[in-house]
């Protein structure tokens, strides 16, 4: 494993730990998820450039599409929660509340 891949793996792990630790605010969770998607994208690009199989070339584009969809849904959810409740706490996302 090269130093670049090791650093990206560490960044992914830190983003995952941030997602698990800072679950109170939706905005911090979304930022950590975007960091994870960025690390996955960079790892996919480096892997596809190193190995050169033709099947790996569209995978970074697919990851970018999923990251854009995740960001759009996350921001829509953040706007809905903050306009409804006035805060971005994740505990407000419980739909079973009366």
UniProtKB/Swiss-Prot annotation:
Q: Which UniProt keywords apply?
A: Electron transport, Membrane, Mitochondrion, Mitochondrion inner membrane, NAD, Respiratory chain, Translocase, Transmembrane, Transmembrane helix, Transport, Ubiquinone
EC number of the protein = 7.1.1.2
The record gives the membrane topology as:
Multi-pass membrane protein
Q: Does the keyword Membrane apply?
A: yes
Q: Which Pfam families match?
A: Oxidored_q2
Q: What is its main location?
A: mitochondrion
What class does this enzyme belong to in the EC scheme?
Answer: translocase
Q: Which InterPro entries match?
A: NADH_UbQ_OxRdtase_chain4L/K (IPR001133), NUOK/Mnh_C1-like (IPR039428)
List membrane-spanning regions: 2-22, 26-46, 61-81
Question: PANTHER family, alphabetically?
Answer: NADH-UBIQUINONE OXIDOREDUCTASE CHAIN 4L (PTHR11434:SF0), NADH-UBIQUINONE OXIDOREDUCTASE SUBUNIT ND4L (PTHR11434)
Family to which this protein belongs = Belongs to the complex I subunit 4L family.
Explain the purpose of this protein: Core subunit of the mitochondrial membrane respiratory chain NADH dehydrogenase (Complex I) which catalyzes electron transfer from NADH through the respiratory chain, using ubiquinone as an electron acceptor. Part of the enzyme membrane arm which is embedded in the lipid bilayer and involved in proton translocation.
**Partners and quaternary state?**
Core subunit of respiratory chain NADH dehydrogenase (Complex I) which is composed of 45 different subunits.
Protein's name in the database: NADH-ubiquinone oxidoreductase chain 4L
Organism listed in the record: Nyctomys sumichrasti (Sumichrast's vesper rat)
